[in-house]
Amino acid sequence: MVFPIWPAHQERMMRQLLQALRQRPAPIVHLFRFPRVTINHAILLFGVAESEPAIQFEAYDPNIPGHPVKLIYERAARAFVLPQAHYWAGGRVSVIEVYRGGLY
């Protein structure tokens, strides 16, 4: 990744991921930080719970195969947050969907 991701893009990505979870199983997302690359990782989304302040995506993380993890979209900040894990200090991440089908 060689460019920053803006809040408006992350809001569109949140909507795209909600739609993806309704239409097909398990979208795969790339999580990263730029310009200081403190995380470069992918997870598989399989569920979602919405509330007024946030959207919590349930995900499979290959680094933590024993239980689901949460990827949180904070509506007010228009940003994704990945909680702390043994490989990550926790905090904001940029998110993009990496595979949507045979033509993408």
Regions found by a protein language model. Name each.
Residues M1-N40:
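Conserved active-site-adjacent core of cysteine acyl-enzyme catalytic domains
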Residues R36-N40, A49-Y104:
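Cys-His-centered catalytic/binding microenvironment captured across papain-like cysteine peptidases
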